[in-house]
Each structure stands twice: as C-alpha cells, then as structure tokens.
Amino acid sequence: MGDILAYEADLLGLVKEFLNFGEFQETLETFTKECKTKGKQLPKTSGLALRESKTLLIQKDLITAFEDGDIKEFFALWQEHIPVETQNTNPVAQKLEFYLQIHFAIFPLKHNQGRIDRTDCEERISHFKTYLETSGAALSQTTEFLPFYALPFVPHPAAHPSFKEIFQESWEAELRMRLEKFLSVILKATSTPRLITLYKESLHNNQELLQQLQQQLMETEHKARTYKKCFNRMQSDYHNLIGVTADLVDSLEATINGKLITPEYLQSVCTRLFSTQMKQSSAQSIDFTRPGTASSMLRASIAPLKQQEVPLFPSLDYEKLKKDLVFGNDRLKALILQALRWRLTRSQPGEQRNTVLQAYISNDLLDCHHNEQKNVLMLLRSPSEVVRQYTALLIDVFSSLAYGRVYISQNPRLLHSLVETWKAEEKESVIRETVLGILQKLSLRRSMQSAMIKDDLIFWLVQELEDTDHLSDYALQYTIALFMNLCLRSAGRKMCSRDADHVLKVLSDLLGHENHEIRSYVNGALYSILAVPSIREEARSMGMEEILRWYIREGNTDMNCHIEFIIKQLNSEDKFDESIESDDEEEEKDDEEDEDALEADLDKDEIIYAQSGELAGEKLLTTDYLGIMTNSFKVKKRMFGGVLQSADEPLQRPVTPSTHRVMNTVRKTSGPPSPPTNTFKTSQANMSVVSSRPPTRSGSRASTSDYCVTSDSIDSEASRLFSPSSQADQRGASSPRILDLGMEKHNGQNSSKAWLPRSPEVLSATSRKARTPTIAPQFSQSGPQQTSYSSSAGSSTRSRQSTQSYRK
C-alpha cells in the first residue's frame, strides 16, 4: 500500500494523459471530478502538454538548422528524433531526405553572398556522394531522382539546365513546407502517452527476454545432452576399468601363490580394456601378449591429440564497413562494432586471430593513420551510450594484443580522447571502466607512459584512489596497476614528489587491502617512488616504517618480503641522480617480451541482440561486407618471452592485472628454482612484535599483530639472491632464469633500467633467444608468487552492469 501511495500521483497522471490523448472527454471529466472528491491530487501539468512543447522545440530546431544550412546539426537531430523504421521504410521520409541532402549540398552555392567557401563546398559534395553510395542508393532506380546522381560530378551545377529548378527560391520554400508538414505528423505520432510507451516497452522487453531465454535453453539442452553422453561413456569406462582392475588384482594374488597367467587370459583382459576405444574385432586382432604392446597403447590413449588446422575468416570490405560506422544509424554501428569485436575474441589464438588482427591493422580499421574530421575513433563521442560502449570494447580488444597496442598508439589524439572519455563518464559506468582498462594496457608502451605522465594523469589516479568506495574491484585493480606502471618511470616518480604527502597517504590506506594483487601493485609503487630522497624524507616524517611493519602478516611470506624490501628502500641513503634517465628514453626496448591475452569476459553481458530477421556477428560481416580474399598474412607467433623476477621483491616492471595473474599461474606450474630452505629464516631472536596500530588513515582495514623479519637477514639474503654466480647455481639447463634485479650502480647511484611496464595480461615463462621486431614494453614474470586470491578481485571479472535500456 505504501508503494501505491508513493507513486499514486504519477499513476493518476498517466491515466489522465491517456484519456486526453484518446479524446475521452466525458470520461476524463468524470475521472477528474472523482479524483477531486476523493482528495486525490492530479499533476498540474499533463505529460502530454510537456511532450507537445518538447515536440515544438525539436521542430523549431530542425527548421532553424534547415534555414541556416547547418548540415551537421540538422542530421544529428534527424537521426535522433525520426524513428529508424520510418527512415528505412517510409517512402515519404526517404524522398524528403533525398531532397534535404540536395538542399544542404548546394546551400553554399545559393547563399554565397558573393564569396564561395570552396572547402565547405567540397565537404558537402563529399557528404552527398557518400549518401548516394549508402542510404540514397535505394532510390537510384527512381526516374525522379536519377539526374541528381550526376550532381557531385558537375563542375558548375548552378549553370547546368538539369539543375535549374533546385537553385530557385520557390524550390527551397516548397521543400521547407514539406519538411514542416512531415515533422508535425511524425513528431506528433512519436509523442504517444507514457502509458502506451510503457506497455510497448514492456511487451518488447518481454519478447526480447523470451527470445534470449529460448536461445539459452536450446544451448543448455544441447550441452546437457552432450554432457550426458560423455558422462554415460565415462561411467561405462569406469565400471569396465573397475572390473578389469579387480581381475588383475586376482591375477596378482594368484601369481604370488605360484599360479601362472596364460597368454589367452592377458589377451582377454586387454581386449576388455580397449573395447570401448576401438571396435571389438580390432581389439581382438591385436596381439597383446607381445611385451610392451598393451602398455604402449595405454600411454598412447592419453596422448594429446594433434592440433587441427583452423580455417581463416573471409576477407571484408573495410571501406564499406568504415563508411557505415561513420554514417550509419546507431543500431547498425553497434552491431558492426559487436561483430568486429567478436571476430577477434571468438577466434582461435594463433594464426586465425593474428590474421584477423593484421587485416584490421592493414586496412586501418580504426583510422589511426588518418586525421579526417569524421572517423571511427570519433564514435567515442557518439551521443549513443551503446555506440560509445561498443567502441570502447573494440579498442579494449586491440589494447589487449601486443600488435594492437602498437597500432592504436600511432594515433596521437587517441590517448587524449580516451582520457577525456574517462573523465567525462559517470563514476560507475561500464564505459569508464572499459576505458580505464585500455589506458592501463597502453601503459605497457613507453611512449604512452610518457604522454600520460605529461598529461598529469598520475594526480587524477591519486584522486581516484583516495575514495575507493565508488570503485568496483575491477576499477580499483586497474587504477592502482596503471598508477604503479607510471611510477616506475623517473618522470613519474618526480611527478609524485610534487605532492608526496598526499600520494603516500593514499598508498598507505591501500596497504591493508584484502586483495593480494592490489597489495602487490601498492608495494611496487611504494618501492619505486621511495627511490626519490624527498619522498623518503616525507615518508619517514609520517612514520611510514611503523605503518609498513604493522602490515607484515604471519604466513604471507611474499608480502612480508615485499615490505622488508620497501623498508630497506625507505631507510636507504642513496641519492636520486636526475641526470640518469635511462628509463625515460623514448626508444621502445625489449618489446619482444610483450604478450597477448584477451580477458575472458570481454563479450560478457551484451546489451544488444539481433532481432528476428536481423543479421549480427559473423553473419552480418559475411553477408553485407564480404570483400575480396586478402587473407594472406603470415604472422610470426611470438612465444612466451621475458624473465622471471624473484617473488620476494615488490613489482619493478610494468604489469597488467590479468597478466600478473597468469604469470603466477605459470610460476606455480613450471615455476623458477626456489631459494634454499634457509632463505629469510626467522627466529624468536630476530622477530619484533608490533604492539599497537600505527597512526594511519586506513582505520577501516582489518589487520592483526604480526611479526616482521629483521633487515640483517634481508641484506645477506638479497646479496646472495641477486649475485650472478648464485643465480647460475640455482638454475638448471631447462629452468627459467631469475631476473637479476639487484639495483645496479652507476657512479654510486641506483639505476632502474631493467624495469619495464606491465599489464594484467599474459606473462612469459621462458626466455626468448632471438629478438623479434619491436612491439611494446614486455610482460615479465615480476610479480610475487600467489598461493590464493581473494574472491573480490582475484579474477578480472568486471563488475559491469550493462545498459538494459537499449535492448531494442
């Protein structure tokens, strides 16, 4: 009852608006009278009146743009307020649009006031040609419009007799009247009562949801049937295996008692064992009594199958694709962006995916090599939220691949557009999180790092990290990882020194975060910026060592060792030589260690689906945009490269969260040589109990009183671990190398030339022998070894909530 009262006035207003729209005047009067009698308050201004006033404003704006010859403003309003169905199917709308295109194409020639802007004329004619090749192509067979297809190619159309009529004032006045009449009818039809709109949207959403559920049901039933067959087969094999095992145990017992096993018995057992994997006759024809036959077949039965060749995708007409991405309607743009993304994300890693990526790059899909006013990257500023989101998702896929990062980094304006989009979007929007992920992955490239630092992105990131309540796990993880990557550069550390107190307080708040990966990035950022003496002094004055020792946790050896290295850096007296800028050189070094990794959830929670009879995905591309076969790219697939950093140290090479995660998985399965068991021994003598919580702003963080290792043991062990001779002793012939991350000395100063950027993608587990062409800063194996992840951010699953309102 309380909910009804809360929305009662709005509901009554909906009823009143509908009765007024349907001209039920007597019913409306009775309804209004009864509401007044019962003390029910009706809204003073009906929704219909508001809609009518809005319609008049829209109509006025369109007419004004028509009279001023403002082609951009006019067609932006046209696309926004004229229904797509009307534009595509209504003959009156199509003919009117054709004449409107002519009006705007010749507008500078008719209203030149003695001076013609040639650049403006060329742009308008080019726009008209594009229209004729796309939307206007449907009218090419109509006699009425056929002469106008030659208009863009006539040097002086005003003097041509075929076009004499359209340059007369009466033609423009008549066209204006037709436009006003059309708008009054169409816009009024679109101003339906909210009650009808709610009903239609609900009905449409229900139908769409039903289609999705039916599709999911079909897929689930198919999977269930497949799994059931697999289960039945496994169950049968299991029962058969148990029976064979029981017989073999009986045979072994009989052998112990002196009874012999006959060849016939062995043949029958092996026939039973292999009967499910081959035909009965084939199993019986094999002589299992020969030594090694049965065991060889058993081993061969579990050998991995030879990888099958994956076919390449058909080539596409990229010029037509880019035209539709720039000039098509919003739904078509979204469907194309979705299909292009799916082609990358749903392709098989290796030659198939590499060929798709190289085709996109060679055809300049994102117009990174062009500076036209209208290009695909401008879709980031589209008024449609779905188009912006799907554009960001496609760029995100590019940024997840090494060659893709090289490609999109070649557009100097892209980074600025991404940063502006990130700042402009709402705090918890999907687009903002996607753009953040792109920026983080681009921070693997040194040129991008330099540009981000020059744009003061570090201070924006500090502001973001200051209030983490509005950040999802994904956003927090990628924000701190991006911040760490920028802090690994000398210029980034200098930037942090401008506001050292603020930066240190924000990082100290994050030291107690429950997520292991986030703490790793915080530790890496702290270790890096503490190389600057002024930041060290500020940290000492705020009691940073006491704060750090508070977070040394019992049982978390990796984090404890990180903190010990940070404390050692904090107490160091080394000077920061600003003349050494080896890590700020713009040359891309060691890019061959960079690796590809697509996040598993890039296609999760799609917000548009193909309607009945509508093409989407690969069907859309191969039906409407099939091109000449050009898939002949042979891309050399780079193997895992890079070297492993000791898990004891804070991160000192740029990283991306999912890379860091995969790297630790690799380390667990084929990990580097472990230090001797006496590494970092702790005893009661070299442990000190922290008795009270230090003065820190992270009071909400949960922590316990733990122990910490004394720095003496760290010094001795670090010198042993970082020495080349010690490393040579530790690794065998096939063991991955441990990166020598000992701080190299140049004239007595620290050098950090071994530090490179990272992104949460895939890291390498083996060294590369041959250098491949320069791509981007490497992924390396520098993260601490992880034994478990918090459920909050241990996976990179985005907390993306899709925009459901566009499901149409």
Curated annotation (Swiss-Prot):
**Coiled-coil segments:** 196-230
Q: What is this protein called?
A: LisH domain-containing protein ARMC9
| UniProt keywords, alphabetically | Cell projection, Cilium biogenesis/degradation, Coiled coil, Cytoplasm, Cytoskeleton
UniProt feature, compositional bias: Polar residues = 655-668, 677-709, 775-784
Protein's organism: Xenopus tropicalis (Western clawed frog)
Cite the PANTHER family for this sequence.
Answer: LISH DOMAIN-CONTAINING PROTEIN ARMC9
Compositional bias (Acidic residues): 579-599
User: What task does this protein carry out?
Assistant: Involved in ciliogenesis. It is required for appropriate acetylation and polyglutamylation of ciliary microtubules, and regulation of cilium length. Acts as a positive regulator of hedgehog (Hh)signaling.
Q: Where is the composition biased (Low complexity)?
A: 785-808
Keyword presence, Coiled coil = yes
Q: Where does the LisH domain lie?
A: 7-39
